[in-house]
Amino acid sequence: MKQNYILYTKLYNDDSFTHLFIFIYNFLFIIIMKQYDYRNPLDIQEALMAAEHKRKLITESKIDAHDKKIRLLFFEFEKYMNVTTYEADDVDIVFIASDSCKYELKNNVLTINDYNNKLIKVDLTNDINNTIIYAKAGYTLNKMTFLLNKFVEAGFIVINDPRKIITSSDKYLTALLLDEYSINQPKYTIVTADDCNTDDPKKDFEKILKPIYGNVNEDNKYVCKLLNGHGGNGVFICKGKNILSIIQCIFSIDDSQKILIQQKLDIKDGDIRAYVLTYNGKQELVTCITRKKANNDFRTNISLGSTFEKFDLTNEQKKFAFNVAEKTGLMFCGVDMCIDEKTNKLYVIEINGAPGAPVPIGLSEEENHHQHAEYYQMFTNKLMSILK
């Protein structure tokens, strides 16, 4: 099932309860969708450990010495453009819709259908040096768990490491990782249903919130995030005077949820996303954009209609983004950063382990294809330069 739903919550207004019913409706939808969320990190980890020795045999010289074009199998979450392949200078990209692809494994040869049901064959023994796997938003799907296990076990280069994608897809684990390396991020706390079910929940909840601002004030604004949301889903802002009631309402629907509550920064000139490749100690900046919120929404997700433009990082900002990307262990990620107007410091907002192409919504099919093609040309060129 496609998970391209959008949470239309707008709880950023002073009167948060005006739109609370919208949030509850969409929250219920997310809960229903959770039954499709599947992870098997133990199986993936075992596969990675079993393949560790084989991976070491894939040397840089082997990648550099190939006499064929590299084939990039791009598992996109859904079919977004009417194209099956795109030929770059050194790479042929084959687009596969990970939510609807069919596959068959016989004699160590994996057969998968692309967007237009053309059969793509991958020899898990002989194609290891000329095929790279890029799975965007595929790690939460049953079939993709199986496929990625097979590719990783065989020793293919897989973007991204399944063990690391689990961390980046969980906002709390990401926050803990940033803490481990003392990387600037908004002050935060994690809240569970038990925190709201005490004898004096108001008093106890204030103790939880106090470290974020150093005080408890009804006008303090907080960014609240469901841990596994993406694309702006499950993210809302509320004031201190409303936060306990709203959180209690969420837990009354699903008391197994955990909610990350963050300090709301005064973001200067929109946020910044740096697309960073990291491999064997080498790093490349694929591109960088700054995103502006749209329609009075505080979120800057392109999928929600925000605008963006190219952004030139300063040396300090580039060094910061590269350091964050390296610490995640991800081969490719989007590092979302912002500059706080009050402190003028650079902060990490989120780390995206499966960043989408920076292409605006609402384009014609022809222009949409053109801009995606330009991005993938740039991406594959950077990818090949870092693999050599």
Where are these regions (language model features)?
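Conserved N-proximal alpha/beta basic substrate-recognition cap immediately N-terminal to
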Residues: D67-K69, E78-N197
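Phosphate-binding site of ATP-dependent enzymes
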Residues: D219-N220, N228-F320
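Acidic/polar hotspots within intrinsically disordered regions
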Residues: N13-D14
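Protein kinase-like catalytic core scaffold
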Residues: Y222, E284-T287, K345-E350
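Active-site nucleotide/adenylate-binding loops and adjacent lid/helix of ATP-dependent enzymes
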Residues: K34, P41, A47, H53-I58, ...
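Hydrophobic alpha-helical signal peptides and transmembrane signal-/tail-anchor segments
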Residues: T18-I31
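C-terminal active-site "lid" helix and adjoining low-complexity regulatory extension at the edge
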Residues: Y38-L48, E60, F308-D312, E326-L330, ...
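A short glycine-rich, hydrophobically flanked beta-strand micro-motif that places a catalytic Asp/Glu
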Residues: Q262-Q263, I272-R273, L330-K342
